[in-house]
Amino acid sequence: MPAKAQAAGKKGSKKAKAPKPSGDKKRRRKRKESYGIYIYKVLKQVHPDTGISSRAMSIMNSFVNDVFERIAAEASRLAHYNKKSTITSREVQTAVRLLLPGELAKHAVSEGTKAVTKYTTSK
């Protein structure tokens, strides 16, 4: 553990970089994926005059990731129990019913069904 704390203290240390070959392109930073734009769109639908801080957005993003992982894990478990190798909308719907309480599950299932219907009709 002390080695990690020591390494964190050497943030500003600079090493000489090897010269790049002339054909190399500048490397791009990996993009951080987030649900931020979708959270913002929903916020504007519900409360058009309300904003959101970057900290609140980060918390909401973590929440969405957590719920997604829980639903995916439960759907995977259900598929495994039924000796299926594919997670279908049926497993996802059952996972949502198991994970979310009462009225929230009903709303989530109806919104999910609506989204799947919209997707299949657009194809």
UniProtKB/Swiss-Prot annotation:
PANTHER family: HISTONE H2B (PTHR23428). Gene3D superfamilies: Histone, subunit A. SUPFAM superfamilies: Histone-fold. Monoubiquitination of Lys-118 gives a specific tag for epigenetic transcriptional activation and is also prerequisite for histone H3 'Lys-4' and 'Lys-79' methylation. There is a cross-link at K118 (Glycyl lysine isopeptide (Lys-Gly) (interchain with G-Cter in ubiquitin)). The keyword Membrane does not apply. InterPro entries: Histone-fold (IPR009072), Histone_H2A/H2B/H3 (IPR007125), Histone_H2B (IPR000558), HISTONE_H2B_site (IPR055333). Belongs to the histone H2B family. The nucleosome is a histone octamer containing two molecules each of H2A, H2B, H3 and H4 assembled in one H3-H4 heterotetramer and two H2A-H2B heterodimers. The octamer wraps approximately 147 bp of DNA. It comes from the Eukaryota. Keywords: Chromosome, DNA-binding, Glycoprotein, Isopeptide bond, Nucleosome core, Nucleus, Ubl conjugation. Residues 1-32 are annotated as: Disordered. Residues 1-10 have a biased composition (Low complexity). GO terms for cellular component: nucleosome; nucleus. Core component of nucleosome. Nucleosomes wrap and compact DNA into chromatin, limiting DNA accessibility to the cellular machineries which require DNA as a template. Histones thereby play a central role in transcription regulation, DNA repair, DNA replication and chromosomal stability. DNA accessibility is regulated via a complex set of post-translational modifications of histones, also called histone code, and nucleosome remodeling. The keyword Cell membrane does not apply. Glycans are attached at S110. It is found in: Nucleus; Chromosome. This is Late histone H2B.L3.
